[in-house]
Amino acid sequence: MSKLKEKREKAVVGIERASKEEAIELARVQIEKAFGKGSLIKMGESPVGQGIKSMSSGSIVLDEALGIGGYPRGRIIEIFGPESSGKTTLTLQAIAEVQKEGGIAAFIDAEHALDPVYAKALGVNVAELWLSQPDTGEQALEIAEHLIRSGGVDLIVVDSVAALTPKLEIDGEMGDSQIGLQARLMSKALRKITGILSKSNTCIMFINQIRMRIGVMFGNPETTTGGNALKFYSSLRLEVRKIEQVTRSGSSDDVIGNKIRVKIVKNKVAPPFRKVELIIYFGKGISREAGILDAAIKHNLIQKTGSWYSLGDNKLGQGRESVIEYLSKEVELANNLDKRLRKIIFNNFDQENDNFIEFKEDESE
């Protein structure tokens, strides 16, 4: 009797489910008539359910920390930090990577301060980069909206939120009080952008600055400009800070770059709060080779014994700087290491059964 009862209960559940699916299908037809085809679909039928596409940051250690192999497409990203901490360099490096893959990028220069010579040194094809230098914050955000709606742009960078000045403020007198204008502008614009962004493969990055809150006695007095809307709508928030200067080997005065720390304070596509350290060389950008070396040590492709670094039975060099310099000269080896690391990190690659890397002897020895 218990088996018969169980069968009857299953049959009733099946009938109920079938009737529910019929009801949902009727509702779906009505919704599509009112709002268009695709207004209501199962997640398995949608690109949303197929995983998030990404674009490389230009650094393998940052790509790993981001959790999906780079910056997510179809999302809003905020990169913030103190002045001269490497924020613009991160975005220009991302533009260079997008262009290498045949993508299209746009730079909305609200600060009117983009240096094409520096951008070119970082690998940006400045001849193919779309540039806008808007007069007002409204103009900048409307241009961004049009670019997203076009569906032809892979990456948009807005530099910076602090420079998105509302038209009312520009037209007003210097001493006029314009409380909350920029915050309201950002809130309205992001509400519009978020909806259309999710239907595209466009990634939009906002560079933001840090301000000090007056009268804060306890806790962190730092905040970002433009109100709270950007914090809310961003899928990814990166805090960038300079931690020390990088000097040439054997000299304490010859500064050749900065070491920065990138902390992922918000991540809606992977686990947050990861930290990575990157080296930015003046006039060259993020050191790809330093990132490859750090990742290779972490994943046991390169072994460190004392001050010596080795790949299998072959010694690469003594001292971190010398190995980074060696990898910068041995481009093929660096590329092979990068490819193998990406397989290990992002595809659960079995490193024991792969002979991908071919070691090239240093002819100078």
From Swiss-Prot:
Residues that hold ATP according to the record: G81, P82, E83, S84, S85, G86, K87, T88
SMART domains named in the record: AAA (SM00382)
Annotated SUPFAM superfamilies: P-loop containing nucleoside triphosphate hydrolases, RecA protein, C-terminal domain
Subcellular location: Cytoplasm
Keyword ATP-binding (UniProt): yes
Keywords recorded for this protein, A-Z: ATP-binding, Cytoplasm, DNA damage, DNA recombination, DNA repair, DNA-binding, Nucleotide-binding, SOS response
Database matches in Gene3D superfamilies: P-loop containing nucleotide triphosphate hydrolases
Gene Ontology cellular-component annotations: cytosol
Entry keyword annotation includes Protein biosynthesis: no
The organism's place on the tree of life at top rank: Bacteria
InterPro entries documented for this protein: AAA+_ATPase, DNA_recomb/repair_RecA, DNA_recomb/repair_RecA_CS, P-loop_NTPase, RecA-like_C, RecA-like_N, RecA_ATP-bd, RecA_C_sf
UniProt-recorded name of the protein: Protein RecA
Organism, as annotated: Borreliella burgdorferi (strain ATCC 35210 / DSM 4680 / CIP 102532 / B31)
Gene assigned in the entry: recA
